[in-house]
UniProtKB/Swiss-Prot annotation:
PANTHER family: IONOTROPIC GLUTAMATE RECEPTOR. Keywords: Calcium, Cell membrane, Cell projection, Cytoplasmic vesicle, Disulfide bond, Glycoprotein, Ion channel, Ion transport, Ligand-gated ion channel, Magnesium, Membrane, Metal-binding, Phosphoprotein, Postsynaptic cell membrane, Receptor, Signal, Synapse, Transmembrane, Transmembrane helix, Transport, Zinc. GO terms for molecular function: glutamate-gated calcium ion channel activity; NMDA glutamate receptor activity; transmitter-gated monoatomic ion channel activity involved in regulation of postsynaptic membrane potential; zinc ion binding. The lineage of its organism: Eukaryota, Metazoa, Chordata, Craniata, Vertebrata. Residues 1001-1010, 1023-1032, 1165-1180 have a biased composition (Polar residues). The record marks 614 as: Functional determinant of NMDA receptors. Residues 1001-1088, 1148-1180, 1335-1372 are annotated as: Disordered. This is Glutamate receptor ionotropic, NMDA 2A. The keyword Cell membrane applies. Zn(2+) binds at residues 44, 128, 266, 282.
Length: 1464
């Protein structure tokens, strides 16, 4: 009963399940049933009920099968009992699969299960014990699968362990256990095909059936410290026992075995040494219950896949009892569906050999407690090990530890320790690196992680390798876990110091700073690197300031430069030039001509400005020696100034990189960071010597910086570059290296690596370590041999340190030049504002400034006069209103008619002979049309062409009250003393506003009132001469009564209420008459009656004027030209009174080409001869008359003895005017110390006219001689030279005319036709018209006694020839009509053509602003060439008339007064 009843109870549940569904038809239509048996050994702490509950509805959900689990526990697991139990189960129930696990380590169990599966075709899964052991040569028809790893897979893990710990040298020991050949073959193949430098020294195969002596002989061949062993567990006990006897299981030997040797981890033979390494299936993390559940899931998933594909599952084998026959292999089995299985998210696939594709293997080691300890895991083809350095175990008590193998800890910190990944191809470390292990956390919450193999190199690693070779030790290197140097926290040391203190490492090598606190717990070697504390900051790209172009000099330098320019230098140059005897003198002292070219303060500033900045601008250079020296020194200063500016400009135009400047740990930015906006941010890496130093010395600083501390150096560098940190405080050696190797060299250390709290790096050893002395000696040896210096050059020198002195250039963009453009934009805006103000002032405000709004002198004029008054101490009286002048309309009309009648009477003086002249005839025709114009107030007959003035109707209007008001407001003016507006005779000193005349006369001028400002200068000139003036005061009173009552002594002659703004700045001064009431009378050499002296047609006003002129003869006139208009030479004035026009003169065609006469050889006049060629034949007085500066050598009123007495010395020529004195007739080669009489009398010590200095005298030789001498040699040459010569610009906008005057010594500006011919007779130019035509064409006689060579004149940009000027009309017409000269003369400039013929050479009272007449009939101005104009006026010479206002003005003429108003 016992045996049968037992099996009955065992098989009954299966039978019930198998037979239950048969009677029910409905059940047949349900899901097919899948019966799975679970058989386990009785030693497992699990019951059958628990096994059945492992598969519940949750696991079966979604499956198309009805899974039934049959659990069976076995008490005995011997092979016979095992086979009996399986066969009885199969006979009692129809099962589709079996999950089997035992508690043995016998590989025979797996062989029996494989046999049963091959005969019954029932899938069997061996999940534990012997059922999962490695077996060789499975049956091909078997469906036996194991939860385990194949021999190849385990061998791979064994080699991976050796590779991670760099155990490249090993030996292989096996027995003849099944599978050993495959094991040896796989290892050899892997080693031969790997890039790892494996060294398999020995392959030993032992036969344990022989005696132990033979085994010992074979084991003695082993010389490696790493041994791979492949055998069964029983054979391993024998082999390891023999190895112990041979000393192969000591401190330095590593035995690595597969799971076949370790077997059941609960059974550990005593022969196994400590430190034995085994590769085993994971029994720690993969429990038996999980394996059972996975086994049932594999069978269920495979059956479902087969059912889905074939719609059925294979029938189970009924029993294993019966005849031993080879059954037929079923057409479809579960085998192919069990190969690729994924269940519950896990890949549970199997290989063709029946092993798992992804087995869960672990690395276990037999620790010193004789227990198996899990130290690593193989998962997804990745090995992770717990120990960074494989622990060395003392296998047995009789084994001595190896003291030469050291465990060394280090810390990653470039350049001292640099950590890199292993080579992906070889999976090893390359040449100059050593293997080191780094702990990597897998789970931050549980601090779970693994040690990964890395490669270390660097400065400290090279020192470690040298120490290893010198001191003779081996080592295992690993990186510190927490990445710290070492700090005591809660009385516990961390970091590298903690590893040494707690003896997990023998020594610590790296950037470990030596300090007092650490020295108390560890021993330090001698320092091998000097270091300390330094500060690193980041360069930030600065922006170029708009004022960068001003930054080469400081503000004080710019201010000093402008002060020196505007205040000191410019004023100094102006003052030196002002008071210089040869300069552009503006002084109005005695003898100084006031109207030379002015050198003002503005011109001085402009000159110095141009010199400073090397601008090619037109400037006026000074002439004084002192001022020239000053300008030369300024030019030298300008060279230095500009060179310095240019040299420094590039440094300021580039974008400057801004660097925070700190001086040390005690800097204000560190101690008081909140004083800056934003606050200064700085930090360090905690738990280091730097933090300790700051904490002990600067508590407040340490408290502030804790929130900015960084995890490591690399994080700090990123924070610096991104602007999260302003400064980083750390070890100087590390920071210097990082600064030298930084990409872009953006990081710098303060003070070029300045170090605070200097210390050094050392090697930390355990307290009392025997290695300290040997390491110290080795380090000192490295320093002495220079090896340490080589290492520093290799590792501690960065590229940025080598290139820090290199200059990098880059293009300048708009940011660099923005300041210059801003300055230009500001200048344009300022110019626009000035332009608007200028127009506003000109059109709206200038009348008030000139006195139009208030009946007072203009503001600018008053300021100028006031400044002059302050400088020269001249008192200026206030003006008084002129008396009222009433004029009725009938009186005005009568005066107009009388004036017209006067002009008509002037025409009666024309004789018939002169009417034949084309000029006279055309003039008569022209005058005829002007009679009614005079009545209409359009002009007068005397000056018919000058109609550019404004008509009377525009001045007075229809209302005569306007005339009364206008006339009442008029001031005293010699030029406007007449009722009719127009041109009137002018005195010589009134004729040219651009020419200042200083006359030495024997008579006082009656009709002229000099300005009060001239009292000192003019009166001082005339003191001697006025004493001899015989003109009585009665004449003056009479003349004063004859003049109109407009005149008032309280008004200056040129001052007007309606003055032109253009004239007020540079008026010519007029002379003030002497204050003495009684003037001495002058001896009159010729007395004539009044009737014969004055023309009958003269008006009362003009007669008064002529009397005044006749009473004041001036024998010597000295003129100094003012600022000239762009120039043309004035031809000599011709007066028909002194020249008899020949009646038979053939006037050529006015439109004839001038070049034709030139080709015909017409006579020409040489104007460019040397004036000193033929003067020996003349007398002294005649020679002296040749100079245009003077009339004669003596005055009319002075005795001859005074003149002779003055020149008794051996004199040559005048030092001022260069004229020859009577006692010398030769050429002068040096400057004479003597002066002529005229220069002495005038006090004109220095002539500032630059043209006068170039003048040379000429000998008035006969015309034929001069012509013959000069024409042949100068004809072609002078023609070419004159084309290239450019004359100095002079103002010739005023044309002279012969004034009407009976006094030949002072001719009037208006005369009759009869007097015109008489006056021309005997004149210096009178002989010009009497020359026969044969003389002109034949002999080359000179018509002019003197000439001025053009080559010695100052140059101008305007052409010499008027024909070259496109703005002037042709001069051929009037040239022929006036003087009859050939228009093709290449050496002279003729008169410009006029649309309307002019009867005489007349002057124009219009300014240069109005050359054209109002009716647009052409040019009205007559220009006379300058080269024949005498420079010293004699009684036959005329002067140009003054410029007047334009046609729109009130036609008042003002004389210019020197003032500084034009300067500003």
């Amino acid at each position: 009963m016992g045996r049968v009843g037992y099996w009955t109870l065992l098989v009954l549940p299966a039978l019930l399940v198998w037979r239950g569904p048969a009677p029910s038809a409905a059940a047949e239509k349900g899901p097919p049933a899948l019966n799975i048996a679970v058989m386990l050994g009785h030693s497992h702490d699990v019951t059958e009920r628990e096994l059945r509950t492992l598969w519940g509805p949750e696991q079966a959900a979604g499956l198309p099968l009805d899974v039934n689990v049959v659990a069976l526990l076995m008490n005995r697991t011997d092979p016979k009992s095992l086979i009996t139990h399986v066969c009885d189960l199969m006979s009692g129930a129809r099962i589709h699969g079996l999950v089997f696990g035992d508690d043995t380590d016998q590989e025979a169990v797996a062989q029996m299960l494989d046999f049963i599966s091959s005969h019954t075709f029932v899938p069997i899964l061996g999940i534990h014990g012997g059922a999962s052991m490695i077996m060789n040569d499975k049956d091909p028809t078997s469906t036996f699968f194991q939860f385990g790893a194949s021999i190849q897979q385990q061998a791979t893990v064994m080699l991976k362990i050796m590779q991670d710990y760099d155990w490249h040298v090993f030996s292989l020991v096996t027995t003849i256990f099944p599978g050993y050949r495959e094991f040896i073959s796989f290892v050899k193949t892997t080693v031969d095909n790997s890039f790892v430098g494996w060294d398999m020294q020995n392959v030993i195969t032992l036969d344990t059936s022989f005696e132990d002596a033979k085994t010992q002989v074979q084991l003695k061949k082993i010389h490696s410290s790493v041994i791979l062993l492949y055998c069964s567990k029983d054979e391993a006990v024998l082999i390891l026992s023999e190895a112990r006897s041979l000393g192969l299981t000591g401190y330095d030997f590593f035995w690595i075995v597969p799971s076949l040797v370790s077997g059941n981890t609960e059974l550990i033979p005593k022969e196994f040494p400590s430190g034995l390494i085994s590769v085993s299936y994971d029994d720690w993390d993969y429990s038996l219950e999980a394996r059972v559940r996975d086994g049932i899931g594999i069978l269920t998933t495979a059956a479902s896949s087969m059912l889905e594909k074939f719609s059925y599952i294979p029938e189970a084998k009924a029993s294993c009892y019966g005849q031993m026959e080879r059954p037929e292999v079923p057409m479809h089995t579960l085998h192919p569906f069990m190969v690729n299985v994924t269940w519950d998210g896990k890949d549970l696939s199997f290989t063709e050999e029946g092993y798992q594709v992804h087995p869960r293997l672990v690395v276990i080691v037999l620790n010193k407690d004789r227990e198996w300890e899990k130290v690593g895991k193989w998962e997804n083809h990745t090995l992770s090990l717990r120990h960074a350095v494989w622990p060395r175990y003392k296998s047995f008590s009789d084994c001595e530890p190896d003291d030469n193998h050291l465990s060394i800890v280090t810390l990653e910190e470039a350049p001292f320790v640099i950590v890199e990944d292993i080579d992906p191809l070889t999976e090893t470390c390359v040449r100059n690196t050593v293997p080191c292990r780094k702990f990597v956390k897998i789970n931050n919450s549980t601090n779970e992680g693994m040690n990964v193999k890395k490669c270390c190199k660097g400065f400290c690693i090279d020192i470690l390798k040298k120490l290893s070779r010198t001191v003779k030790f081996t080592y295992d290197l690993y990186l510190v876990t927490n990445g710290k140097h070492g700090k005591k926290v809660n009385n516990v040391w961390n970091g590298m110091i903690g590893e040494v203190v707690y003896q997990r490492a023998v020594m610590a090598v790296g950037s470990l700073t030596i300090n007092e606190e650490r020295s108390e717990v560890v021993d330090f070697s001698v320092p091998f690197v000097e270091t300390g504390i330094s500060v690193m900051v980041s360069r930030s790209n600065g922006t170029v300031s708009p004022s960068a172009f001003l930054e080469p000099f400081s503000a004080s330098v710019w201010v000093m430069m402008f002060v020196m320019l505007l205040i000191v230098s410019a004023i100094a140059v102006f003052v030196f030039e002002y008071f210089s005897p040869v300069g552009y003198n503006r002084n109005l002292a005695k003898g100084k001509a006031p109207h030379g070219p002015s050198f003002t303060i503005g011109k001085a500033i402009w000159l110095l400005w141009g010199l400073v900045f090397n601008n090619s601008v037109p400037v006026q250079n000074p002439k004084g020696t002192t001022s020239k020296i000053m300008v030369s020194v300024w030019a030298f200063f300008a060279v230095i100034f500009l060179a310095s500016y240019t040299a420094n400009l590039a440094a300021f135009m580039i974008q400057e990189e801004f660097v925070d400047q700190v001086t040390g740990l005690s800097d204000k930015k560190f101690q008081r960071p909140h004083d800056y906006s934003p606050p200064f941010r700085f930090g360090t890496v905690p738990n280091g010597s730097t933090e300790r130093n700051i904490r002990n010395n600067y508590p407040y600083m340490h408290q502030y910086m804790t929130k900015f501390n960084q995890k490591g150096v690399e994080d700090a560098l990123v924070s610096l570059k991104t602007g999260k940190l302003d400064a980083f405080i750390y070890d100087a050696a590390v920071l210097n290296y990082k600064a030298g190797r930084d990409e872009g060299c953006k990081l710098v250390t303060i003070g070029s690596g300045y170090i605070f709290a200097t210390t050094g790096y050392g090697i930390a050893l355990q307290k009392g370590s025997p290695w300290k002395r040997q390491i110290d000696l080795a380090l000192l040896q490295f320093v002495g041999d220079g090896e340490m210096e080589e290492l520093e050059t290799l590792w501690l020198t960065g590229i940025c340190h080598n290139e820090k002195n290199e200059v990098m250039s880059s293009q300048l963009d708009i940011d660099n030049m923005a300041g210059v453009f801003y300055m230009l934009a500001a200048a344009m805006a300022l110019s626009l504002i000035t332009f608007i103000w200028e127009h506003l002032f000109y059109w709206k405000l200038r009348f008030c400034f000139t006195g139009v709004c208030s009946d007072r002198p203009g503001l600018l004029f008053s300021i100028s006069r006031g400044i002059y008054s302050c400088i020269h101490g001249v008192h200026i009286e206030e003006k008084k209103k002129s008396p009222d002048f009433n004029l009725t309309g009938s009186q005005s009309n009568m005066l107009k008619l009388l004036r017209s009648a006067k002009n008509i009477s002037n025409m009666s003086n024309m004789n018939s002979s002169r009417m034949d002249s084309p000029k006279r005839a055309a003039d008569f025709i022209q005058r005829g049309s002007l009679i009614m114009d005079m009545v209409s107030d359009k002009g007068n007959l005397m000056y018919s062409d000058n109609r550019s003035f404004q008509g009377k109707e525009s001045i007075f209007g229809d209302n005569m009250n306007e005339l009364q008001t206008f006339v009442a407001n008029r001031q005293k003016d010699n030029l406007n003393n007449y009722v009719f507006q127009g041109q009137h005779p002018l005195t010589l000193n009134e004729s040219n506003p651009n020419t200042v005349e200083v006359a030495v006369s024997t008579e006082s001028k009656v009709n002229s009132r000099p300005r009060q400002l001239w009292k000192k200068s003019v009166d001082s000139i005339r003191q001697d001469s006025l004493s001899q003036n015989p003109v009585s005061q009665r004449d003056e009173a009479t003349a004063e009564n004859r003049t109109h009552s407009l005149k008032s002594p309280r008004y200056l002659p040129e001052e007007m209420a309606h003055s032109d703004i253009s004239e007020t700045s540079n008026r010519a001064t007029c002379h003030r008459e002497p204050d003495n009431s009684k003037n001495p009378k002058t001896k009159d050499n010729f007395k004539r009656s009044v009737a014969s002296k004055y023309p009958k047609d003269c008006s009362e006003v003009e007669r008064t004027y002529l009397k005044t002129k006749s009473s004041s003869p001036r024998d010597k006139i000295y003129t100094i030209d003012g600022e000239k208009e762009p120039g043309f030479h004035l031809d000599p004035p011709q007066f028909v009174e002194n020249v008899t026009l020949p009646e038979n003169v053939d006037f050529p065609d006015p439109y004839q080409d001038p070049s034709e006469n030139l080709r015909k050889g017409d006579s020409t006049l040489p104007m460019n001869r040397n004036p000193l060629q033929n003067e020996e034949g003349l007398s002294n007085n005649d020679q002296y008359k040749l100079y245009s500066k003077h009339f004669t050598l003596k005055d009319k009123g002075s005795p001859h003895s005074e003149t002779s007495e003055r020149y008794r010395q051996n004199s040559t020529h005048c030092r001022s005017c260069l004229s020859n004195l009577p006692t010398y007739s030769g050429h002068f080669t040096m400057r004479s110390p003597f002066k002529c009489d005229a220069c002495l009398r005038m006090g004109n010590l220095y002539d500032i006219d630059e043209d006068q200095m170039l003048q040379e005298t000429g000998n008035p030789a006969t015309g034929e001689q001069v012509y013959q001498q000069d024409w042949a040699q100068n004809n072609a040459l002078q023609l070419q030279k004159n084309k290239l010569r450019i004359s100095r610009q002079h103002s010739y906008d005023n044309i002279v005319d012969k004034p009407r005057e009976l006094d030949l010594s002072r001719p009037s500006r208006s005369i009759s036709l009869k007097d015109r011919e008489r006056l021309l007779e005997g004149n210096f130019y009178g002989s010009l018209f009497s020359v026969p035509s044969s003389k002109l064409s034949g002999k080359k006689s000179s018509l002019f006694p003197q000439g001025l060579e053009d080559s010695k004149r100052s140059k101008s940009l305007l052409p010499d020839h008027t024909s070259d000027n496109p703005f002037l009309h042709s001069h051929r017409d009037d040239q022929r009509l006036v003087i009859g000269r050939c228009p093709s003369d290449p050496y002279k400039h003729s008169l410009p053509s006029q649309a309307v013929n002019d009867s005489y050479l007349r002057s124009s009272l219009r300014s240069t602003a109005s050359y054209c007449s109002r009716d647009s009939r052409g040019h009205n101005d007559v220009y006379i060439s300058e080269h024949v104009m005498p420079y010293a006026a004699n009684k036959n010479n005329m002067y140009s008339t003054p410029r007047v206002l334009n046609s729109c003005s009130n036609r008042r003429v003002y004389k210019k007064m020197p003032s500084i108003e034009s300067d500003v």
